[in-house]
A protein has these predicted regions:
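A short, structured loop/turn motif at beta-sheet edges
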Residues: 54-58, 84-92, 124-129
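Sec-dependent bacterial lipoprotein signal peptides
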Residues: 1-17
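Hydrophobic/aromatic beta-strand elements that line small-molecule binding cavities or substrate pockets
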Residues: 50-54, 80-83, 120
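A short-motif feature that recognizes glycine-rich, charge-decorated loops
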Residues: 63-104
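Short, flexible N-terminal segments of the mature chain
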Residues: 50-69
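Short, well-ordered, aromatic-rich surface patches in folded extracellular/luminal domains
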Residues: 3, 19-44, 50, 94-162
Length: 162
């Protein structure tokens, strides 16, 4: 009876320890956690619409919507684009965000009574902050990310492989 209880305790402890250690990995075994991500949603005007994800393994995806030319400083066709990036450069962006106290921010800044405002959801090392109304001014960080996006070598993804 005692052995059975001990076995249950060890199995439960093992399960609990493995829960905190789960992390997405690619087939090569490297982390695919989102190091830096930024998603901007539409408004009724000319707000840029896109979704960027830079993973810890250097793979990046960019889903380009409308009105992105000015934000990126170049023209990219609408649709999905991929790139292999220098993780060190994007790590500096993450470091800058951490230095600003990004990981202490609330997950959501919004007021549903306010209409026609785009939102920006910034993800740094897996922590996401949706900022639509009443949140901190993260515009300098958004601009830095958009400038980096504009300098990257993006490859358009064929529609059938999306």
């Amino acid at each position: 009876m005692i052995r059975g209880r001990l076995l249950c305790v060890f199995v439960a402890a093992g399960c609990l320890m493995s829960c905190g250690a789960s992390q997405e990995t690619t087939s090569s075994g490297t982390s695919s956690v989102v190091l830096v991500g930024l998603e901007k949603t539409p408004c009724h005007g000319r707000c840029p619409v896109y979704s960027l994800r830079v993973h810890g393994d250097g793979k990046a995806t960019l889903d380009v919507g409308r009105f992105c030319d000015e934000a990126f400083g170049r023209s990219l066709s609408q649709g999905r684009h991929t790139a292999q990036v220098d993780v060190g450069v994007w790590g500096l962006v993450a470091d800058e965000a951490h230095a600003m106290g990004f990981d202490t921010l609330a997950q959501r800044y919004d007021d549903p009574r306010v209409v026609d405002l785009p939102s920006a959801t910034l993800t740094i090392d897996g922590h996401s902050v949706m900022n639509r109304y009443g949140g901190p001014n993260l515009n300098e960080l958004y601009t830095r990310i958009e400038r980096l996006v504009g300098r990257m070598n993006w490859q358009a993804t064929p529609e059938d492989s999306r």
